[in-house]
């Protein structure tokens, strides 16, 4: 028969005089220190609580132990000094059988959830008469919590200035406040049945928030009720010493949170502490159902903070050597002080980001030793133990992890080919860089990693494979790859659904090159998860994106993905196009662009054919100039868009992508500014009836507005953002949106502002036309022109406005499929809309075109008839007669009025 082991946990309280054998031992908890009469003792008397674990074999030995505790009576004299046991109690009774430990509380002691032995590995049973704590012995941690006396907690606020000395229990000011509070509360509570002691446990900031703990032998409900009954007495006693804040005094019987750092607290309490020595900042915790949870933390190593300040001193005259030395100093500090506090994480990410931006702007190169220092720094802050602190940081800086990833990629691109190959394999990050040579033409590129997650020996593998067919053009200089398991835990996951990153995050950077197909292989971290999605981190929208990536194969442990380069018209406002509708959007884009370009060319041909017939009044001439430039601007913009769509979206050695962005931006702006010129013309001819601006002056205004303003905006945009590499997106050839400067606003704001202005102009003009002021009468020709302008503007402006309005929708709600389809549809067919509503809507142009086509048709028919008549008659059957056309007259009339015609008639008087 196997006998279980039993324990009786006993609680002793000693007082030790000067020179006592207990001394100052860290293993013994000092409860409080009192100054006593020096005549009786040579020094202060200290009170200790001693917790003893005593083993017994059966119930008889247990009874003997209980009786022994009862026989212990003060004072006891020891040879090392005067020791007095003031109380001795059994607290917890435990028995162990077959590896399972079960404990119950002794008389007047109880469990204080979640203090049941080891809260993580034990379960508190409350259904029985005596609540018991049950757990497996092999799971217990080194420190466990046993049954305690009944405790009641209380807090109140003192209207005095808080000082950091109140956080130090050894300081004089702490002792002053604590001793005064304990004396007054003890007087108020000493007559309560079961009351044993009261002790100040903490002071918090917020005036001075004092927390105290009352210990008693009665039940929690009885002790709490008694303390509440004498609450007024306690407040009056405290008010004699301190100015209390009204309504701040409260007591509660259950501490939701209680630990050695933040003390006790009830639900939703917040407690702020200064950081420990050597750090600057504060740490704030909130009491939640699971205990104290850190919600804010700014603890930055003092050395790091100083280093961050020193960085600004080298920016003005920075050199590669200075930057390299700075990174080396940062690496040394991190290596000597590896603590990954939230403040340290934020500070390191900020420093690395600043180094990256400075190096990119100054075109610095990064040596192999500097790159090794960067990877060592990254390995430290990507420690899997720091994930909890990353979670806290991401509450304040949501995209700090994205910023880190982008920074590491940018710094990696600064390593010259001559410093490669390099390979840094650390515990939490792997980095590899190679120079590209002609062997890539034959064998392609492969990058493989093997990393072990925390608390497991099973490796997680990953692989990047680029086929040799992707290197058939001029070769890139370098290929950089890196991988990390921790990044998958800290990069934000979309709020939609409960997805999680289930593999390593792998990054491959090929500068100045275009890759159209890449295969990726991932080991699953958790093989039981299903329905994998192949995604990439979208730096433009700061989220996971599946555009251009799809699942190739899935086994129980391995997922294979394929990613390709995709471009659609929808990138003008949003680079994210859901993969489910991408073929539709792409088809709409290119078919629509073909029709649009053809329509615009037709617009220009029609204008060229009938330019002289239409050019009569100043208003008509100016309108034609505007329409021609609108068509021309959109035509060139569409061509440049196609150029941008055919080059690599990330880089191009000749700068074609940057040029495409600039000219697309410029000519799309020109389109809108020429529309604004149309609006101004319309308002001018209606409102200022008797004012006539000179033709050359009106043209000067038109061309300055139509091309001058767009040129200024475009040049300023590229001049401000290109040096910091924030001008264009990394994934598509278009203006950037994700960075702080947001150069895309340099297009969106003017375009939408012009659309809004033109709507207002149309409304004003329509009102003026319906109710003209007395004396304001236009000529018939000018009024017809104005009506034509109004029709064109009224239809053309809403179409263009809606187009870019739906584009804004693709940014705000990138997951909405309707935004992308409508946006692509309206944008792709803009040229066709201009042909219909800007050219064919004009009745004069329509009539001229009809006449031209009719004349051509009649001429062909006449030629055919004459040819038929000649073939029916014999040769020379009629003598030559120079007057054979007598009686036949050809009438042709051309005019400049609205009823212009070109008509050919044949009549006979015979």
From Swiss-Prot:
Lineage, uppermost ranks: Eukaryota, Metazoa, Chordata, Craniata, Vertebrata
Effect seen on changing residue 831 to A: Strongly decreased G protein-coupled receptor signaling
Pfam family, one: 7tm_2
Glycosylation site residues: 139, 168, 205, 282, 310, 317, 329, 354, 368, 389, 410, 423, 437, 455, 512, 528, 553, 736, 739
Cytoplasmic side: 610-621, 685-696, 768-784, 843-910
Keyword Transmembrane annotated: yes
Full protein name: Adhesion G-protein coupled receptor F1
Coiled-coil intervals: none
Gene name, Swiss-Prot/TrEMBL: ADGRF1
Record site feature (Cleavage), residues: 566-567
Source organism (scientific name): Homo sapiens
Effect of residue 681 to A/H: Retains G protein-coupled receptor activity
Span list, region Stachel: 568-576
Annotated phenotype, changing residue 755 to A: Strongly decreased G protein-coupled receptor signaling
Effect the entry attributes to changing residue 830 to A: Strongly decreased G protein-coupled receptor signaling
Gene3D superfamilies according to UniProt: 1.25.40.610, 2.60.220.50, Rhodopsin 7-helix transmembrane proteins
Tissue: Mainly expressed in the kidney. Up-regulated in lung adenocarcinomas and prostate cancers.
Mutation effect (residue 801 to A): Strongly decreased G protein-coupled receptor signaling
Molecular function terms from GO: G protein-coupled receptor activity
Phenotype upon changing residue 675 to A: Strongly decreased G protein-coupled receptor signaling
Disulfide bonds: 257-287, 275-299, 534-561, 549-563, 657-733
Membrane topology: Multi-pass membrane protein
Processing after translation: Autoproteolytically processed at the GPS region of the GAIN-B domain; this cleavage modulates receptor activity.
């Amino acid at each position: 028969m196997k006998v279980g082991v039993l324990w009786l946990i006993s609680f002793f309280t000693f007082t030790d005089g000067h020179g006592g054998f207990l001394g100052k031992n860290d293993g013994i908890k000092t409860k409080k220190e009192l100054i006593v009469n020096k005549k009786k003792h040579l020094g202060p008397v200290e009170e200790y609580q001693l917790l003893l674990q005593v083993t017994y074999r059966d119930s008889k030995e247990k009874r003997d132990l209980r009786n022994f505790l009862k026989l212990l009576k003060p004072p006891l004299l020891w040879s090392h000094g005067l020791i007095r046991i003031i109380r001795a109690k059994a607290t917890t009774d435990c028995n162990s059988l077959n590896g399972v430990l079960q404990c119950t509380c002794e008389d007047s002691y109880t469990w204080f959830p979640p203090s049941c032995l080891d809260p993580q590995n034990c379960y508190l049973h409350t259904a029985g008469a005596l609540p018991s704590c049950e757990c497996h012995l092999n799971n217990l941690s080194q420190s466990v919590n046993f049954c305690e006396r009944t405790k009641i907690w209380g807090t109140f606020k003192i209207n005095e200035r808080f000082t950091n000395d109140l956080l130090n229990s050894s300081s004089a000011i702490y002792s002053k406040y604590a001793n005064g509070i304990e004396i007054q509360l003890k007087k108020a509570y000493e007559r309560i049945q079961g009351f044993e002691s009261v002790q100040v446990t903490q002071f918090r900031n917020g005036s001075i928030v004092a927390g105290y703990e009352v210990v008693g032998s009665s039940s929690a409900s009885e002790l709490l009720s008694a303390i509440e009954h004498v609450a007024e007495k306690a407040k009056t006693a405290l008010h004699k010493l301190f100015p209390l804040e009204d309504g701040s005094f409260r007591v509660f019987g259950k501490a939701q949170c209680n630990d050695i750092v933040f003390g006790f607290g009830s639900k939703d309490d917040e407690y702020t502490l200064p950081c420990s020595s050597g750090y600057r900042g504060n740490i704030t915790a909130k009491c939640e159902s699971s205990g104290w949870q850190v919600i804010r933390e700014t603890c930055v190593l003092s050395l790091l903070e100083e280093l961050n300040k020193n960085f600004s001193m080298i920016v003005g005259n920075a050199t590669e050597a200075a930057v390299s030395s700075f990174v080396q100093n940062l690496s040394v500090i991190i290596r000597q002080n590896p603590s990954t506090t939230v403040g340290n994480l934020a500070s390191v990410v900020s420093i690395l980001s600043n180094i990256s931006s400075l190096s990119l702007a100054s075109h610095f190169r990064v040596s192999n030793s500097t790159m090794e220092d960067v990877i060592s720094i990254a390995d430290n802050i990507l420690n899997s133990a720091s994930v909890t602190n990353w979670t806290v940081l991401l509450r304040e800086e949501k995209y700090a992890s994205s910023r880190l990833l982008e920074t590491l990629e940018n710094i990696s691109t600064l390593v010259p080919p001559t410093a490669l190959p390099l390979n840094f394999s650390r515990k939490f990050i792997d980095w590899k860089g190679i120079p590209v040579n002609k062997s890539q033409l034959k064998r392609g590129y492969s990058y493989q990693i093997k990393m072990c997650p925390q608390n497991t020996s099973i490796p997680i593998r990953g692989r990047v494979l680029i086929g040799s067919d992707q290197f058939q053009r001029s070769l890139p200089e370098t290929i950089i790859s890196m991988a990390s398991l921790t990044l998958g835990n800290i990069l934000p996951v979309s709020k939609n659904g409960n997805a999680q990153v289930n593999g390593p995050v792998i990054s491959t950077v090929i500068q100045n090159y275009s890759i159209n197909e890449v295969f990726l292989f991932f080991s699953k971290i958790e093989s039981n998860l299903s329905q994998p999605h192949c995604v990439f981190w979208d730096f433009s929208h700061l989220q996971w994106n599946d555009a251009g990536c799809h699942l190739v194969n899935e086994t129980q442990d391995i997922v294979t993905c394929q990613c390709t380069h995709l471009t659609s018209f929808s990138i003008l406002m949003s680079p994210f196009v859901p993969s489910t509708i991408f073929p539709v959007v792409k088809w709409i884009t290119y078919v629509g662009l073909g029709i649009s370009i053809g329509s615009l060319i037709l617009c220009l041909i029609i204008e060229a054919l009938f330019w002289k017939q239409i050019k009569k009044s100043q208003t008509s001439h100016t309108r034609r100039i505007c329409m021609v430039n609108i068509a021309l601007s959109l035509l060139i913009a569409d061509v440049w868009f196609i150029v941008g769509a055919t080059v690599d979206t990330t880089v191009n050695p000749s700068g074609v992508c940057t040029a495409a962005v600039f000219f697309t931006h410029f000519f799309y702006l020109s389109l809108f500014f020429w529309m604004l010129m149309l609006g101004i013309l319309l308002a001018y001819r209606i409102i200022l009836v008797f004012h006539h601006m000179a033709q050359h002056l009106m043209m000067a205004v038109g061309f300055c507005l139509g091309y001058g303003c767009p040129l200024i905006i475009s040049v300023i945009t590229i001049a401000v953002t290109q040096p910091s590499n924030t001008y264009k997106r990394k994934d598509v050839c278009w203006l950037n949106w994700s960075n702080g400067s947001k150069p895309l606003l340099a297009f969106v704001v003017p375009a939408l502002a012009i659309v809004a202005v033109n709507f207002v102009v149309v409304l004003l003009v329509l009102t003026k036309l319906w109710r003209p002021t007395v004396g304001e009468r236009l000529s018939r020709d000018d009024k017809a022109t104005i009506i034509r302008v109004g029709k064109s503007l009224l239809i053309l402006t809403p179409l263009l406005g809606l187009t870019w309005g739906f584009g804004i929708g693709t940014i705000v709600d990138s997951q909405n499929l309707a935004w992308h389809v409508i946006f692509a549809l309206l944008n792709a067919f803009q040229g066709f809309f201009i042909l219909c509503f800007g050219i064919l809507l004009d009745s004069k142009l329509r009539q001229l075109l009809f006449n031209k086509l009719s004349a051509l048709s009649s001429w062909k028919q006449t030629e055919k008839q004459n040819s038929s008549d000649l073939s029916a008659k014999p040769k020379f059957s009629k003598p030559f007669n120079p007057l054979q056309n007598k009686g036949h007259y050809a009438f042709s009339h051309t005019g400049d009025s609205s009823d212009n015609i070109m008509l050919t008639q044949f009549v006979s008087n015979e």
